[in-house]
């Protein structure tokens, strides 16, 4: 089947001219990432299907007003009553329960909250309606940072606060979602990393080989509260909804040492934080779109793909100016212009792109190997069958995300995993750590295949990608 997708700066139709040149992408010549079901391939824009909205909040009449901007002054009034309705709180609770999560500072687990669910939701509804709701402190814990010896902070709101945040998000997310730029892919209904990666590959194949590789420094922790609130207020005029948002922004953070009140940033661990982060960066998205820049953004990770060094430097200058005015910072050592016609490349969403090729970046591979190492220690007392069972979801899940990598990626990884297992078997047989040829003869690849070990090469073959020896 022949598919040709046309890349346009103006998005006006099936074929267009950019800088005096016809630009088209023949998907037959590339291995593209799959496109989500909600991305409109004919216009390369985002057409939101409203199945994801909370039906308990958004009536057909409200959705019609949303699509036509048919509200007074372009702002939405009287929304707080939509937040505290029991159907909305019940829908929010269902999502919180499905997402699981630990107890917050009140030590109340999801199971405990559910034991008296009707009373808990009724009490929360009354507090939100009366204006007496005050979020509790966020519990801060430190967890290992993957691929690093450092720890990173994790915020855990109480179950009650997670329900309230989800209820608020159910109300305000569609108001902003309808206007978000097409090139924003992170934390949006029906969109994901695969869509963003696919767009990057399309642009590279079309000749946009000068890349602004941008890195926002500590973005989620540095968003100015006042400026964020102003952006939310451009579409929401309900003072009580804005006050509820303020309460979450100034939510205390409690650690084992002290309690602090954040002066900037989105709430740690909050359900609403991803939406707020997109709201704050949307003006940058709109600026890049207005100036014809091919930007692809996933949360705070974004690249701008250009046709020339001059265009890329101009785009980077525009981003630097905007971030400075917005109270944000670009990492000076990690923000750069990359010329893909020369040696070198860039990383985006776990992949490394370089001169027409792509493969898992080193850090992505290292994280996977660290997880494998933890299971395949030579001192492990588990049976080989038990070890292979534990490895399967790790290897299979990693492959599913990176399966669009170059075919030469897989064989070395298979060899590495099998060698880890051979080392375990060799130790159990009290064989010295030499004579690996004998190990291969005693435990050939077919032996591990019979044991059910997941194989990257075999998975790639099933996916229609021949192995590269």
Predicted regions and their residues:
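Non-catalytic, polymerase-adjacent accessory regions of viral genome-replication enzymes
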Residues: 1-118
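Amphipathic alpha-helical blocks
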Residues: 112-135, 398
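A glycine-rich phosphate-binding loop feature that marks nucleotide/adenosyl-phosphate handling sites
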Residues: 335-343, 390-394, 412-418, 434-441
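Conserved polymerase palm-domain catalytic core
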Residues: 127-142, 146-150, 171, 179-345
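A conserved non-catalytic segment of reverse transcriptases
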Residues: 250, 321, 326-397
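Non-catalytic, peripheral interaction segments enriched in hydrophobic/basic residues
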Residues: 387-429
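Extended C-terminal regions of large enzymes
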Residues: 420, 425, 429-469
């Amino acid at each position: 089947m022949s598919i040709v997708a046309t890349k346009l700066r103006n998005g006006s139709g099936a074929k267009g001219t950019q800088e005096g040149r016809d630009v088209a992408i023949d998907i037959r010549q590339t291995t593209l990432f799959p496109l989500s079901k909600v991305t409109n391939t004919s216009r390369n824009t985002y057409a939101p299907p409203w199945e994801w909205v909370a039906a308990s909040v958004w009536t057909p009449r409200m959705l019609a007003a949303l699509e036509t901007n048919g509200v007074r002054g372009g702002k939405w009034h009287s929304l707080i009553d939509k937040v505290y309705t029991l159907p909305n709180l019940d829908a929010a609770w269902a999502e919180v329960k499905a997402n699981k999560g630990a107890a917050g500072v009140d030590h109340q687990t999801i199971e405990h909250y559910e034991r008296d669910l009707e009373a808990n939701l009724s009490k929360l509804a009354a507090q939100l309606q009366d204006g007496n709701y005050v979020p509790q402190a966020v519990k801060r814990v430190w967890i290992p940072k993957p691929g690093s010896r450092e720890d990173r902070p994790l915020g855990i709101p109480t179950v009650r606060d997670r329900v309230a945040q989800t209820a608020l998000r159910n109300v305000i997310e569609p108001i902003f979602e309808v206007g978000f730029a097409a090139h924003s892919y992170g934390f949006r209904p029906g969109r994901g990393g695969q869509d963003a990666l696919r767009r990057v590959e399309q642009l590279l194949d079309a000749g946009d080989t000068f890349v602004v590789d941008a890195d926002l420094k500590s973005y989620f922790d540095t968003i100015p509260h006042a400026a964020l609130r102003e952006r939310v207020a451009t579409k929401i005029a309900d003072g009580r909804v804005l006050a509820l948002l303020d309460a979450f922004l100034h939510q205390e953070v409690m650690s084992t040492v002290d309690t602090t009140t954040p002066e900037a940033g989105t709430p740690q661990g909050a359900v609403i934080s991803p939406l707020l982060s997109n709201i704050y960066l949307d003006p940058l998205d709109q600026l890049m779109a207005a100036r014809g820049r091919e930007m692809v953004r996933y949360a705070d990770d974004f690249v701008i793909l250009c046709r020339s060094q001059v265009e890329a430097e101009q785009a980077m200058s525009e981003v630097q100016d905007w971030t400075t005015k917005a109270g944000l910072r670009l990492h000076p050592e990690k923000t750069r212009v990359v010329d893909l016609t020369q040696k070198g490349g860039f990383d985006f969403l776990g992949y490394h792109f370089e001169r027409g090729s792509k493969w898992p970046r080193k850090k992505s591979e290292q994280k996977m190997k660290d997880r494998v190492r933890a299971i395949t220690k030579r001192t492990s007392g588990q049976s080989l069958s038990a070890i292979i069972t534990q490895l399967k979801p790790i290897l299979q899940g990693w492959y599913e995300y990176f399966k669009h990598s170059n075919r030469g990626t897989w064989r070395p990884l298979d060899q590495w995993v099998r060698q880890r297992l051979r080392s375990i078997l060799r130790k159990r047989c009290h064989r010295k750590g030499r004579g690996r040829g004998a190990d291969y003869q005693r435990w050939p690849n077919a032996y591990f295949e019979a044991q059910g070990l997941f194989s990257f090469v075999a998975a790639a073959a099933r996916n229609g990608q021949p192995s590269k020896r």
